Structure formats: C-alpha cells, structure tokens
C-alpha cells in the first residue's frame, strides 16, 4: 500500500484551545493514536474516529 502523504504529518493541535478528542496516524509507531485537536487550523492527519484513521492510513 502506498501511504497518503498526509499520514506522515505529525499531530497538529492548532492554535485554538477547544481540546477536541481526535485521532492521527503516528508514522513512526505505524498506528493511529489519540490526540487533542484545538478546533482550528491543524493539518490533514486528523480524524474524528480511529476507524476513519485506520481506513485512510493503515494498510
């Protein structure tokens, strides 16, 4: 499987302070992990559920 490039991006909470539970793909660990999204900006490596993260980034 050729990974999408956004799956390699680090978790990016962004500058806002909402602390919304979200998931990102941890490229080094090769798995989806929880992080807290601030609610604005950030990057494309952010998913509302672990299942969506796995579908996008896990082989």
From Swiss-Prot:
SUPFAM superfamilies: BPTI-like
Segment forming the signal sequence: none
Keywords: Disulfide bond, Ion channel impairing toxin, Potassium channel impairing toxin, Protease inhibitor, Secreted, Serine protease inhibitor, Toxin, Voltage-gated potassium channel impairing toxin
Coiled-coil residue spans: none
Gene3D superfamilies tied to this protein: Pancreatic trypsin inhibitor Kunitz domain
UniProt key word NADP: no
A single MF term (Gene Ontology): potassium channel regulator activity
Transmembrane feature ranges: none
One Gene Ontology CC term in the entry: extracellular region
Descriptive protein name: Kunitz-type serine protease inhibitor dendrotoxin DaE1
Native source organism of the sequence: Dendroaspis angusticeps (Eastern green mamba)
């Amino acid at each position: 499987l050729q990974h999408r490039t956004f799956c390699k991006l680090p978790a990016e909470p962004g500058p806002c302070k909402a602390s919304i539970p979200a998931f990102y793909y941890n490229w080094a660990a090769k798995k989806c992990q929880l992080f807290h999204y601030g609610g604005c900006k950030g990057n494309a490596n952010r998913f509302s559920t672990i299942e969506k993260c796995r579908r996008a980034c896990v082989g």
